[in-house]
Amino acid sequence: MASEAPSPPRSPPPPTSPEPELAQLRRKVEKLERELRSCKRQVREIEKLLHHTERLYQNAESNNQELRTQVEELSKILQRGRNEDNKKSDVEVQTENHAPWSISDYFYQTYYNDVSLPNKVTELSDQQDQAIETSILNSKDHLQVENDAYPGTDRTENVKYRQVDHFASNSQEPASALATEDTSLEGSSLAESLRAAAEAAVSQTGFSYDENTGLYFDHSTGFYYDSENQLYYDPSTGIYYYCDVESGRYQFHSRVDLQPYPTSSTKQSKDKKLKKKRKDPDSSATNEEKDLNSEDQKAFSVEHTSCNEEENFANMKKKAKIGIHHKNSPPKVTVPTSGNTIESPLHENISNSTSFKDEKIMETDSEPEEGEITDSQTEDSYDEAITSEGNVTAEDSEDEDEDKIWPPCIRVIVIRSPVLQIGSLFIITAVNPATIGREKDMEHTLRIPEVGVSKFHAEIYFDHDLQSYVLVDQGSQNGTIVNGKQILQPKTKCDPYVLEHGDEVKIGETVLSFHIHPGSDTCDGCEPGQVRAHLRLDKKDESFVGPTLSKEEKELERRKELKKIRVKYGLQNTEYEDEKTLKNPKYKDRAGKRREQVGSEGTFQRDDAPASVHSEITDSNKGRKMLEKMGWKKGEGLGKDGGGMKTPIQLQLRRTHAGLGTGKPSSFEDVHLLQNKNKKNWDKARERFTENFPETKPQKDDPGTMPWVKGTLE
């Protein structure tokens, strides 16, 4: 058998191809391409959404613009409808041959810059006289009423007077009066005819001349016009206004003090009118026409004034509240104009006219017939119509004017007091003066029952000359401190001290904070809740950050508290008595006698051997007796079946002041008997004694007291 041929050698393995790496790269590229496509798709969707939102925004803008135009058109239509319902017409009365005033000729443009009154007052009065003369000449034939405005002038420079339809609707009586006047003019002189024609021409402007006051009364606004000073006076508030041509509104000029204040009856009537205004706001227009008609029947003489300030009389109803309170007789008024004062006899004349009207009312105070309209009814209806006119903007403007007219109130907050609650609020108004004192029967506004407060300590009232609240100390015993300064001397009635916002007044031990705000405005410092919350926070901080007391200070505090307790129970004059009961002669100590006669046995003997894990418990042991009664026998384990532990628990010693697990415990046998410090000292003393006195022998220990060690038995 031939030998087998050797097998050919194995070929080396082929080299690894780079295909797997290319495949991985291709997969990564495909994955990135897919992500890129998804990102592009998301970008396209976002662009579509953006275009869609832009279209929606454009549509919304166009819709809003259309709605704005529609609202403007509807508002114009509504305004025209209201004008038609009110039957008002625009009438422009030309009373001058020359061009109207320009802004540069306006009197009040340089009013506050000049020290004295400008010379234009006389020029304006001359122009008014010329205007009246031209109106008289034109009224000889017929009254020329032009409906076209002056050419080439601004709308604000034209003198417009809105004539309400009620001048013609209820004009039966004035028409008959004019007819009688025309018949009487035929036989009268030329001067009387010219005067009557002038009055008839000016009557259409809404002004009537009051002979008693020498001023012109406007029925549309309720103001008196002073032609000399070119000011408008509101008798209900005592404010002088001037007409601003640029804004077309009445601007505040000055104010006079009205004394006395309105009575309670007038306040009640105002409240009733405000209630009517809230209940029936829709009937304002009808009431306005009705009451204006009733007022126009009482107009008896008119003068025409052709100045640009009379342009917006009807709009003034929305700027200031009109009330027929000019029947009250205020004092004589001086109007301040840039340093000089212009005396105006307005209030004297008004008082004379009111007295004349009151006499007339008393004369005709008879029982009215059915359907007859009295003067009081017309005045009340006119006042109700004026107060009921306007909208929310008018009410806001009235509130602002009232806030400016009436002085603010004082909100008094108790900051610190031993008798009053901290954070209490007291309100002081300008109507009645406020008093501060201790007496209970005097009905003080702010009563402080302290010893350091006088019966009538101080008074606070509103000074109309200074236009501020003042504090007057009534000669108190301890005086008054304002802002930490003793400005009010004790026992002397001092001069009035002007109070300002934020002043702190200390009366006795009570500290008061005065807050003065216009209207109903408040701050955090005059709100009782805010003040008490801050005080509570301060108390908490003080309790947490209290100072640490030393040993001596604590002892002083203890003695102080002990004295308080003695004073509380009436023991401040008695000393401390120890065993007061035993010292009582009637007390018998029976327990002491029994101890002396019978004595007492200790259940625990001091010579008992201590327990040990190496010695057996004796039969007299209480624990062993208890176990035997329960069924335990010597040599058995514990438990019901006797399978419990038989050996005692080993004693383990640990280091002092060390917790469990800190170190390895040691048994009792490994620890030597350590002698305490006292025994060591005695041993040292014995050694010294034996060295000094060797002939004496130390006493041996008592053989009965042997230490218990391992292996010892009883």
From Swiss-Prot:
Post-translational modification Phosphoserine, affected residues: 7, 11, 344
Lineage, opening ranks: Eukaryota, Metazoa, Chordata, Craniata, Vertebrata
Bias (Pro residues): 1-18
Domain (FHA): residue spans on this chain: 434-487
Coiled coil start-end: 18-88
Role summary: Promotes angiogenesis and the proliferation of endothelial cells. Able to bind to endothelial cells and promote cell proliferation, suggesting that it may act in an autocrine fashion.
GO BP, one annotated term: vasculogenesis
Location of the region described as Disordered in the Swiss-Prot/TrEMBL record: 1-22, 259-307, 322-384, 586-617, 655-714
Acidic residues composition-biased segments: 364-383
Modified residues (N6-acetyllysine): 664
Effect caused by changing residue 133 to K: Displays a stronger angiogenic activity
Modified residues (N-acetylalanine): 2
Summary of subunit composition and partner proteins: Interacts with the secreted angiogenic factor TNFSF12.
Domain of life: Eukaryota
Gene Ontology CC: cytoplasm; extracellular region; perinuclear region of cytoplasm
Localization of this protein: Cytoplasm; Secreted
Domain G-patch: 619-665
Originating organism: Homo sapiens
Gene this protein is translated from: AGGF1
Tissue/organ expression: Widely expressed. Expressed in endothelial cells, vascular smooth muscle cells and osteoblasts. Expressed in umbilical vein endothelial cells and microvascular endothelial cells.
Signal peptide start-end: none
Bias kind Polar residues: ranges: 335-355
Protein name: Angiogenic factor with G patch and FHA domains 1
GO molecular function, one term: identical protein binding
Alphabetized UniProt keyword annotations: Acetylation, Angiogenesis, Coiled coil, Cytoplasm, Developmental protein, Differentiation, Phosphoprotein, Secreted
Compositionally biased spans, kind Basic and acidic residues: 279-298, 586-609, 680-690
Family annotation (SMART domains): FHA, G_patch
